[in-house]
Amino acid sequence: MTDISVQSNTALESSETTHFGFTTVAKEEKVAKVAQVFHSVAAKYDIMNDLMSGGIHRLWKRFTIDCSGARPGQRVLDLGGGTGDLTAKFSRIVGEKGHVILADINNSMLNVGRDKLRDSGIVGNVHYVQANAEELPFPDDYFDIITISFCLRNVTDKDKALRSMFRVLKPGGRLLVLEFSKPVFDPLSKVYDAYSFHLLPKMGELVANDADSYRYLAESIRMHPDQETLKGMMQEAGFENTSYYNLTGGIVALHRGYKF
Protein backbone atom coordinates (compact mmCIF):
# COMPACT_ATOMS: atom_id res chain seq x y z
CA MET A 1 0.00 0.00 0.00
CA THR A 2 1.06 3.55 -0.56
CA ASP A 3 2.37 5.34 2.52
CA ILE A 4 0.56 8.45 3.68
CA SER A 5 2.56 11.40 4.99
CA VAL A 6 0.58 14.11 6.74
CA GLN A 7 1.88 17.12 8.62
CA SER A 8 -0.12 19.92 10.15
CA ASN A 9 0.37 23.34 8.57
CA THR A 10 -0.91 25.11 11.65
CA ALA A 11 1.80 27.40 12.99
CA LEU A 12 2.60 27.33 16.68
CA GLU A 13 1.92 30.95 17.44
CA SER A 14 1.36 30.80 21.17
CA SER A 15 3.89 32.50 23.38
CA GLU A 16 2.80 30.42 26.37
CA THR A 17 5.35 28.27 28.15
CA THR A 18 5.41 24.61 29.04
CA HIS A 19 7.93 22.13 30.43
CA PHE A 20 10.65 20.21 28.65
CA GLY A 21 11.65 17.83 31.40
CA PHE A 22 12.34 20.07 34.38
CA THR A 23 13.06 23.11 32.19
CA THR A 24 10.47 25.77 31.34
CA VAL A 25 10.42 26.57 27.62
CA ALA A 26 8.14 28.20 25.06
CA LYS A 27 5.63 25.75 23.59
CA GLU A 28 7.11 25.94 20.11
CA GLU A 29 10.56 25.31 21.57
CA LYS A 30 9.37 22.11 23.25
CA VAL A 31 8.12 20.76 19.93
CA ALA A 32 11.58 21.23 18.40
CA LYS A 33 13.41 19.83 21.43
CA VAL A 34 11.26 16.71 21.64
CA ALA A 35 11.73 16.17 17.91
CA GLN A 36 15.50 16.34 18.34
CA VAL A 37 15.38 13.80 21.18
CA PHE A 38 13.60 11.23 19.05
CA HIS A 39 15.66 11.92 15.93
CA SER A 40 18.65 11.15 18.15
CA VAL A 41 17.36 7.95 19.78
CA ALA A 42 15.41 6.39 16.88
CA ALA A 43 18.14 4.02 15.68
CA LYS A 44 18.76 2.60 19.18
CA TYR A 45 15.19 2.92 20.47
CA ASP A 46 14.31 -0.78 20.55
CA ILE A 47 17.62 -1.83 22.07
CA MET A 48 17.32 0.79 24.79
CA ASN A 49 13.73 -0.23 25.55
CA ASP A 50 14.85 -3.79 26.21
CA LEU A 51 17.79 -2.67 28.32
CA MET A 52 15.90 -0.02 30.31
CA SER A 53 12.98 -2.28 31.19
CA GLY A 54 14.71 -5.64 31.24
CA GLY A 55 12.31 -6.62 28.48
CA ILE A 56 9.24 -5.98 30.66
CA HIS A 57 7.93 -3.41 28.17
CA ARG A 58 6.90 -6.36 26.01
CA LEU A 59 4.61 -7.62 28.78
CA TRP A 60 3.11 -4.13 29.26
CA LYS A 61 2.37 -3.96 25.54
CA ARG A 62 0.92 -7.46 25.49
CA PHE A 63 -1.42 -6.46 28.33
CA THR A 64 -2.45 -3.41 26.30
CA ILE A 65 -3.32 -5.62 23.34
CA ASP A 66 -5.30 -7.95 25.61
CA CYS A 67 -7.29 -4.99 26.99
CA SER A 68 -7.98 -3.54 23.54
CA GLY A 69 -10.62 -6.06 22.53
CA ALA A 70 -9.25 -5.94 18.98
CA ARG A 71 -11.06 -8.17 16.49
CA PRO A 72 -10.70 -9.07 12.80
CA GLY A 73 -11.86 -6.34 10.44
CA GLN A 74 -11.39 -3.42 12.83
CA ARG A 75 -9.64 -0.12 12.19
CA VAL A 76 -6.87 0.74 14.68
CA LEU A 77 -4.75 3.85 15.24
CA ASP A 78 -1.38 3.23 16.91
CA LEU A 79 -0.62 6.85 17.79
CA GLY A 80 2.96 7.78 18.61
CA GLY A 81 3.59 4.20 17.58
CA GLY A 82 7.27 4.76 16.84
CA THR A 83 8.98 1.51 15.94
CA GLY A 84 5.73 -0.39 15.60
CA ASP A 85 5.57 -2.98 18.39
CA LEU A 86 1.82 -2.56 18.88
CA THR A 87 1.16 -2.11 15.16
CA ALA A 88 2.74 -5.50 14.45
CA LYS A 89 0.44 -7.22 16.93
CA PHE A 90 -2.68 -5.36 15.80
CA SER A 91 -1.91 -6.13 12.15
CA ARG A 92 -2.07 -9.85 12.82
CA ILE A 93 -5.29 -9.55 14.84
CA VAL A 94 -7.35 -7.37 12.48
CA GLY A 95 -6.28 -9.37 9.44
CA GLU A 96 -6.80 -8.66 5.77
CA LYS A 97 -10.16 -6.96 6.25
CA GLY A 98 -8.83 -4.73 9.01
CA HIS A 99 -6.58 -1.70 8.87
CA VAL A 100 -3.88 -0.34 11.18
CA ILE A 101 -2.42 3.15 10.94
CA LEU A 102 0.96 3.68 12.59
CA ALA A 103 1.14 7.43 13.22
CA ASP A 104 4.03 9.39 14.68
CA ILE A 105 5.02 13.05 14.53
CA ASN A 106 8.69 12.10 14.23
CA ASN A 107 9.75 10.91 10.77
CA SER A 108 12.92 9.23 12.07
CA MET A 109 10.88 7.00 14.39
CA LEU A 110 8.33 6.38 11.65
CA ASN A 111 11.02 5.31 9.19
CA VAL A 112 12.54 2.88 11.70
CA GLY A 113 9.11 1.41 12.38
CA ARG A 114 8.24 1.07 8.69
CA ASP A 115 11.53 -0.64 7.85
CA LYS A 116 11.23 -2.98 10.83
CA LEU A 117 7.68 -4.08 10.03
CA ARG A 118 8.34 -4.54 6.32
CA ASP A 119 11.44 -6.60 7.09
CA SER A 120 9.17 -8.77 9.27
CA GLY A 121 6.75 -9.27 6.39
CA ILE A 122 4.03 -7.05 7.85
CA VAL A 123 2.52 -5.39 4.79
CA GLY A 124 -0.88 -4.95 3.20
CA ASN A 125 -3.05 -3.76 6.08
CA VAL A 126 -0.74 -1.12 7.59
CA HIS A 127 -0.37 2.53 6.60
CA TYR A 128 2.21 4.99 7.94
CA VAL A 129 1.20 8.56 8.73
CA GLN A 130 3.30 11.44 10.01
CA ALA A 131 0.86 13.37 12.17
CA ASN A 132 0.53 15.57 15.25
CA ALA A 133 -1.55 14.04 18.06
CA GLU A 134 -3.08 17.46 18.76
CA GLU A 135 -4.44 17.79 15.20
CA LEU A 136 -5.15 14.31 13.90
CA PRO A 137 -5.78 14.33 10.12
CA PHE A 138 -8.54 11.73 10.15
CA PRO A 139 -12.34 11.88 9.79
CA ASP A 140 -14.67 11.97 12.78
CA ASP A 141 -15.75 8.59 14.19
CA TYR A 142 -13.13 6.70 12.18
CA PHE A 143 -11.28 4.23 14.47
CA ASP A 144 -12.51 1.32 16.56
CA ILE A 145 -9.41 1.44 18.77
CA ILE A 146 -6.75 4.04 19.51
CA THR A 147 -3.59 3.28 21.45
CA ILE A 148 -0.95 5.77 22.50
CA SER A 149 2.05 4.08 24.08
CA PHE A 150 4.88 5.91 25.88
CA CYS A 151 4.10 9.03 23.89
CA LEU A 152 1.51 11.22 25.65
CA ARG A 153 4.02 12.66 28.11
CA ASN A 154 5.93 14.18 25.17
CA VAL A 155 2.86 15.94 23.75
CA THR A 156 2.80 19.69 24.38
CA ASP A 157 -0.98 20.10 24.81
CA LYS A 158 -2.22 16.82 26.23
CA ASP A 159 -5.81 18.02 26.68
CA LYS A 160 -6.00 19.04 23.03
CA ALA A 161 -4.54 15.69 21.97
CA LEU A 162 -7.09 13.76 24.04
CA ARG A 163 -9.93 15.76 22.48
CA SER A 164 -8.50 15.02 19.04
CA MET A 165 -8.40 11.30 19.82
CA PHE A 166 -11.99 11.43 21.08
CA ARG A 167 -13.12 13.07 17.84
CA VAL A 168 -11.68 10.38 15.55
CA LEU A 169 -12.81 7.44 17.69
CA LYS A 170 -16.04 5.69 16.71
CA PRO A 171 -18.94 5.56 19.17
CA GLY A 172 -18.36 2.36 21.12
CA GLY A 173 -14.62 2.59 20.50
CA ARG A 174 -11.93 2.62 23.15
CA LEU A 175 -8.74 4.55 23.86
CA LEU A 176 -5.82 2.93 25.65
CA VAL A 177 -3.01 5.08 27.06
CA LEU A 178 0.10 3.15 28.11
CA GLU A 179 2.51 5.47 29.87
CA PHE A 180 5.02 5.78 32.66
CA SER A 181 3.32 6.92 35.84
CA LYS A 182 3.75 7.26 39.61
CA PRO A 183 4.91 4.24 41.65
CA VAL A 184 2.41 3.36 44.36
CA PHE A 185 4.97 2.24 46.95
CA ASP A 186 7.37 4.71 48.53
CA PRO A 187 10.37 2.30 48.68
CA LEU A 188 9.88 1.57 44.98
CA SER A 189 9.79 5.30 44.23
CA LYS A 190 13.19 5.80 45.85
CA VAL A 191 14.79 2.93 43.96
CA TYR A 192 13.14 4.09 40.73
CA ASP A 193 14.43 7.65 41.19
CA ALA A 194 17.97 6.41 41.76
CA TYR A 195 17.76 4.26 38.64
CA SER A 196 16.16 6.96 36.49
CA PHE A 197 18.45 9.86 37.33
CA HIS A 198 21.75 8.05 37.76
CA LEU A 199 21.85 4.78 35.84
CA LEU A 200 19.57 5.62 32.93
CA PRO A 201 21.60 8.57 31.54
CA LYS A 202 24.79 6.51 31.88
CA MET A 203 23.16 3.65 29.98
CA GLY A 204 22.09 6.11 27.28
CA GLU A 205 25.62 7.43 27.00
CA LEU A 206 27.11 3.94 26.77
CA VAL A 207 24.66 2.38 24.30
CA ALA A 208 23.30 5.33 22.31
CA ASN A 209 26.03 7.91 22.90
CA ASP A 210 23.32 10.23 24.20
CA ALA A 211 22.99 10.84 27.94
CA ASP A 212 20.94 14.03 27.55
CA SER A 213 18.01 12.40 25.75
CA TYR A 214 17.68 9.78 28.46
CA ARG A 215 17.98 12.41 31.17
CA TYR A 216 15.03 14.13 29.49
CA LEU A 217 13.20 10.79 29.50
CA ALA A 218 13.52 10.54 33.28
CA GLU A 219 12.47 14.15 33.79
CA SER A 220 9.50 13.89 31.41
CA ILE A 221 8.17 10.93 33.37
CA ARG A 222 8.21 12.93 36.60
CA MET A 223 6.36 15.83 34.94
CA HIS A 224 3.64 13.61 33.48
CA PRO A 225 0.23 13.62 35.21
CA ASP A 226 -0.27 10.88 37.79
CA GLN A 227 -2.85 8.15 37.43
CA GLU A 228 -5.87 9.98 38.86
CA THR A 229 -5.02 13.25 37.10
CA LEU A 230 -4.78 11.56 33.71
CA LYS A 231 -8.04 9.73 34.34
CA GLY A 232 -9.69 13.09 35.00
CA MET A 233 -8.19 14.57 31.84
CA MET A 234 -9.64 11.72 29.79
CA GLN A 235 -13.05 12.31 31.33
CA GLU A 236 -12.83 16.03 30.56
CA ALA A 237 -12.09 15.13 26.92
CA GLY A 238 -15.34 13.17 26.77
CA PHE A 239 -14.28 9.60 27.54
CA GLU A 240 -16.54 7.49 29.74
CA ASN A 241 -16.09 4.38 31.89
CA THR A 242 -12.47 5.45 32.38
CA SER A 243 -10.23 3.25 34.48
CA TYR A 244 -6.58 2.37 34.86
CA TYR A 245 -4.34 -0.52 35.80
CA ASN A 246 -1.08 -0.04 37.67
CA LEU A 247 1.65 -2.19 36.14
CA THR A 248 4.93 -3.04 37.88
CA GLY A 249 3.89 -1.18 41.01
CA GLY A 250 2.68 1.89 39.14
CA ILE A 251 5.92 2.52 37.26
CA VAL A 252 3.63 2.20 34.26
CA ALA A 253 -0.15 2.62 34.08
CA LEU A 254 -2.59 1.58 31.39
CA HIS A 255 -5.58 3.93 31.17
CA ARG A 256 -8.68 2.93 29.25
CA GLY A 257 -11.71 4.99 28.24
CA TYR A 258 -14.67 4.63 25.90
CA LYS A 259 -16.61 6.88 23.55
CA PHE A 260 -20.38 6.40 23.70
Swiss-Prot record:
<keyword id="KW-0489">Methyltransferase</keyword>
<dbReference type="GO" id="GO:0009060">
    <property type="term" value="P:aerobic respiration"/>
</dbReference>
<comment type="similarity">
    <text>Belongs to the class I-like SAM-binding methyltransferase superfamily. MenG/UbiE family.</text>
</comment>
<keyword id="KW-0474">Menaquinone biosynthesis</keyword>
<dbReference type="GO" id="GO:0009234">
    <property type="term" value="P:menaquinone biosynthetic process"/>
</dbReference>
<protein>
    <recommendedName>
        <fullName>Ubiquinone/menaquinone biosynthesis C-methyltransferase UbiE</fullName>
        <ecNumber>2.1.1.163</ecNumber>
        <ecNumber>2.1.1.201</ecNumber>
    </recommendedName>
</protein>
<feature type="binding site">
    <location>
        <position position="149"/>
    </location>
    <ligand>
        <name>S-adenosyl-L-methionine</name>
    </ligand>
</feature>
<feature type="binding site">
    <location>
        <position position="83"/>
    </location>
    <ligand>
        <name>S-adenosyl-L-methionine</name>
    </ligand>
</feature>
<feature type="binding site">
    <location>
        <position position="104"/>
    </location>
    <ligand>
        <name>S-adenosyl-L-methionine</name>
    </ligand>
</feature>
<dbReference type="GO" id="GO:0032259">
    <property type="term" value="P:methylation"/>
</dbReference>
<dbReference type="GO" id="GO:0008425">
    <property type="term" value="F:2-methoxy-6-polyprenyl-1,4-benzoquinol methyltransferase activity"/>
</dbReference>
<keyword id="KW-0831">Ubiquinone biosynthesis</keyword>
<dbReference type="GO" id="GO:0043770">
    <property type="term" value="F:demethylmenaquinone methyltransferase activity"/>
</dbReference>
<dbReference type="InterPro" id="IPR004033">
    <property type="entry name" value="UbiE/COQ5_MeTrFase"/>
</dbReference>
<comment type="pathway">
    <text>Cofactor biosynthesis; ubiquinone biosynthesis.</text>
</comment>
<dbReference type="InterPro" id="IPR029063">
    <property type="entry name" value="SAM-dependent_MTases_sf"/>
</dbReference>
<comment type="pathway">
    <text>Quinol/quinone metabolism; menaquinone biosynthesis; menaquinol from 1,4-dihydroxy-2-naphthoate: step 2/2.</text>
</comment>
<keyword id="KW-0949">S-adenosyl-L-methionine</keyword>
<keyword id="KW-0808">Transferase</keyword>
<comment type="function">
    <text>Methyltransferase required for the conversion of demethylmenaquinol (DMKH2) to menaquinol (MKH2) and the conversion of 2-polyprenyl-6-methoxy-1,4-benzoquinol (DDMQH2) to 2-polyprenyl-3-methyl-6-methoxy-1,4-benzoquinol (DMQH2).</text>
</comment>
<feature type="binding site">
    <location>
        <begin position="132"/>
        <end position="133"/>
    </location>
    <ligand>
        <name>S-adenosyl-L-methionine</name>
    </ligand>
</feature>
<dbReference type="Pfam" id="PF01209">
    <property type="entry name" value="Ubie_methyltran"/>
</dbReference>
<dbReference type="InterPro" id="IPR023576">
    <property type="entry name" value="UbiE/COQ5_MeTrFase_CS"/>
</dbReference>
